[in-house]
Each structure stands twice: as structure tokens, then as C-alpha cells.
A protein has these predicted regions:
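Active-site pocket-lining segments that scaffold enzyme catalytic pockets across diverse folds
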Residues: 1-7
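Thiamine diphosphate
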Residues: 11-167
Length: 167
């Protein structure tokens, strides 16, 4: 699993269980939006028999979404999750918390399922979190590059990253 440094990483830090070393990758602290998809593609090429997943937010995935075309062109069956909260969630929360206002963090996201299909990848939208498992089973069985969009309204499970511990 490759995680972009977005809101989903806060949730995964709290709830994701890693059972094997070197199976969860996060460029934490570097602000490298767009990291997950190209990294996952490279890992899938290196380990073709292991499912590889990229976890992105809707804003961060726009930095490297074109790499999905590369996965299609070379038949690299990577799984791309896009958690769509219509913006830069980490920065949104940071601005709300520190300044009480927002600037440049709310965006209008494209139709990610349609975009994936336009690249020749498989695309599915999951509007009910109880259906995520079904979507994962579906994309694992078709063995082609796939995008799973999950519309959401994330709230951070914890806010330690922005707490001023000196107070």
C-alpha cells in the first residue's frame, strides 16, 4: 500500500494494521502530493504477483493521475483509491484550525470514474463504505489498472500534527 500524504494517511496511521515489513509506504512530512500512484506502479512491476494499492485524495491524485495511462499501456494492474472530499483536506483542516478561514483549498473534482475509463482503466464509485470490500474483490478479479472512487467528508481522527505542544 502506497499512501499519499493526504487526509487518508491520518486515518491509516490510526487504523491500518501492517502485518509485514515494507508493505505500507508514506512520504510523511515531505509534502509530496502525487507520490502514491507512480510508486505503486513501480512496486507492481517489481512484484507482479502481489496486489498493490495507491491511496490518494482527490486533489493530490491530480498531480500524477496521467500515470494511470502508463499502467494501462503496459498492463500493470495497480489499484488506485481516490478519496474524494472536494479539496485539499489536510490544508483545509489546518486553515480552519489556525486561521478560522480557508483559501484555495476547496476544489471541484473531475468525474474520476469517467477519467479512469477514458484512459482505458476500470473505474468504480463506492457511495456506501460497506461496499468497499465488494469493489476491491471486483478489481482484483479483472486484473487491469483500476480506480475506486470513494466520495467522503473526512474528519481527522486525531489532530496531533497541528497541535502546539508548548501550551
Amino acid at each position: 500500500v502506497f499512501n499519499d500524504p493526504t487526509t487518508i494517511v491520518f486515518w491509516m496511521r490510526s487504523y491500518w494494521k501492517t502485518y509485514l515489513p515494507r508493505t505500507w509506504f508514506v512520504p510523511s512530512g515531505f509534502g509530496t502530493l502525487g507520490f502514491a500512484l507512480p510508486s505503486a506502479i513501480g512496486a507492481k512491476v517489481a512484484k507482479p504477483n502481489i496486489p498493490v494499492v495507491a491511496m490518494h485524495g482527490d486533489a493530490g491524485v491530480m498531480f500524477t493521475i496521467q500515470d494511470l495511462m502508463t499502467a494501462v499501456e503496459h498492463t500493470i494492474p495497480v489499484i488506485l483509491f481516490v478519496f474524494n472530499d472536494q479539496g485539499y483536506g489536510v490544508e483545509r483542516r489546518h486553515q480552519d484550525h489556525l486561521y478560522g478561514r480557508r483559501s484555495g483549498v476547496d476544489i471541484q473534482s473531475p468525474d474520476f470514474v469517467g477519467l479512469a475509463k477514458s484512459f482505458g482503466a476500470h473505474g468504480v464509485r463506492v457511495d456506501d463504505l460497506s461496499k468497499v470490500g465488494e469493489a476491491v474483490s471486483e478489481v482484483l478479479n479483472i486484473n487491469k489498472p483500476s480506480l475506486i472512487e470513494v466520495p467522503c467528508d473526512f474528519k481527522h481522527p486525531g489532530y496531533g500534527s497541528f497541535i502546539d505542544w508548548s501550551k
